[in-house]
Design a protein with these regions (language model features):
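N-terminal export/assembly segments and adjacent metallocofactor-ligating motifs
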Residues: 1-183, 191-205, 223, 227, ...
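Flexible glycine/proline-enriched surface loops and loop-helix/loop-strand junctions
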Residues: 16, 114, 155-156, 209-213, ...
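Conserved short loop/turn motifs at secondary-structure junctions
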Residues: 49-57, 216-220, 244-251
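Short helix-capping/linker segments at secondary-structure and domain boundaries
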Residues: 75-76, 178-186, 251-252, 267-274
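Short hydrophobic/charged patches on amphipathic alpha-helices used for structural packing
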Residues: 103-105, 231, 316
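Core structural elements
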Residues: 202, 227-238
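A glycine-rich, hydrophobic/aromatic-adjacent loop/helix-cap motif
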Residues: 234-321
Length: 328
């Protein structure tokens, strides 16, 4: 039952329509806060969850997860970026230790080779695409676009139409060419990498990693020649690798991102001007929402929280089951 002071104020509210009332901001927040605490007391702290977003600022994302974890004492906090680009975070943190782009977009003007995979860049990231198109038109960089369909960006460079669900296959084929032709950067590998020999043996002994395999895939036989060409350009020039949701929203998304980072490390295309790894995020603060801890399994700065919460699909199941009573 409502507290006496809130109940008294409800009676004075002006009707907006048959379902809603007009109410001052201070009163509505007080009412919402009371209801959340009422749910917590009746059903426990796990009956509440928070769903953040990747279009908010870093500051608001930090305060949001702090409210869920510290004020409501619930571990259930998530945001939409975990669904779309968590494979980039996982793949990059596993291989290079940090799940973020490694260089600024203006490095596009300083690179010699651009590879774009799984991204309709002109539509989704037009400011980035403008830089790519300028570099391709000015012939300061070669451009290779790898996708399951033809995109507008491919008009300005080489287009590789690949089979559906073949991202990891194609990336391993690029690695096979670089390894078999010894185009890798031995100095960088010796000073910066571990596990190279095991990785090399794994790729070279995988029959599906040889681009010759594409001769057996009807309609894609031409990739037997195109994939090695892209791989050689990537290995022998200052190169940047861009990818989008066409990589990450697949079952093998994390592994595909790891394959991309492996390519950059063994060729030394990271940590220098005009080289690097560039995940193209779906919203304006995907990186910040994750960095500040709006994830069920990470706190701010990717610290491990005291309790791991549920992810969005699990939370929806819990709502249907009647176990989650409130979501903010």
């Amino acid at each position: 039952e409502l507290p006496r002071e809130l109940k008294a104020r409800v009676k004075t509210l002006k009707s907006f329509d048959e379902n809603y009332y007009e109410a001052p901001y201070e009163f509505t927040t007080s009412l919402a806060a009371w209801k959340l605490m009422d749910i917590k007391e009746k059903y426990g702290r796990h009956a509440f969850c928070g769903m953040g977003g990747a279009r908010t600022s870093c500051e608001s994302s930090y305060v949001f997860q702090k409210f869920v974890r510290n004020a409501m004492n619930s571990p259930h906090v998530d945001n939409c970026a975990r669904v779309c680009h968590s494979p980039s975070l996982k793949g990059m943190r596993t291989t290079i230790g940090e799940g973020a782009a490694t260089n600024p977009f203006d490095d596009i003007y300083k690179t010699e080779n651009i590879v774009v995979m799984g991204s309709n860049t002109t539509e989704a990231h037009p400011i980035v695409a403008n830089r790519m198109i300028k570099a391709a038109r000015d012939k300061t960089a070669t451009l290779s676009v790898i996708d399951v369909r033809q995109t507008q960006l491919s008009k300005f460079g080489e287009q590789l139409i690949i089979p559906y669900e073949a991202n990891l296959l194609v990336l391993n084929m690029m690695a096979y060419v670089i390894l078999s032709e010894k185009l890798y950067n031995t100095e960088f590998i010796d000073s910066r990498c571990t596990g190279f020999e095991a990785y090399k043996d794994s790729i070279l002994n995988d029959p599906y990693a040889n681009p010759e395999y594409m001769k057996n895939v009807s309609g894609y036989e031409y990739l037997t020649e195109q994939i090695p060409t892209v791989a050689r350009l990537y290995a022998t020039k200052k190169s940047m690798f861009f990818w989008g949701l066409g990589i990450t929203e697949h079952l093998d998304g994390s592994y595909a991102v790891m394959a991309i980072t492996h390519l950059s490390m063994m060729t030394g295309n990271i940590g220098k001007t005009g080289t690097g790894l560039m995940p193209l995020r779906g919203q304006n603060n995907v990186q910040g929402a994750c960095d500040t801890g709006c994830l069920p399994y990470y706190g701010p700065d990717y610290s491990v929280p005291e309790e791991i919460g549920l992810m969005t699909p699990q939370l929806i199941d819990e709502m249907i089951a009647g176990k989650i009573k409130a979501m903010y």
